[in-house]
């Protein structure tokens, strides 16, 4: 369960990073 939560966090962070890069 912990690993799944970590993977979800990584996915969310990657999505945020992509959105930030798009803004720039």
From Swiss-Prot:
Primary localization: secreted
GO MF: receptor antagonist activity
Annotated InterPro entries: Humanin
Tissue and organ expression note: Highly expressed in testis. Also expressed in kidney, heart, skeletal muscles and brain.
Protein location: Secreted; Cytoplasm
The keyword Cytoplasm appears for this protein: yes
Cellular component GO terms, alphabetical: cytoplasm; extracellular region
A single GO BP: negative regulation of execution phase of apoptosis
Family, per entry: Belongs to the humanin family.
Function: Plays a role as a neuroprotective and antiapoptotic factor.
The protein, known as: Humanin-like 3
Organism ancestry: Eukaryota, Metazoa, Chordata, Craniata, Vertebrata
């Amino acid at each position: 369960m912990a690993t799944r939560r970590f993977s979800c966090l990584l996915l969310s962070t990657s999505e945020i990073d992509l959105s930030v890069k798009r803004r720039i």
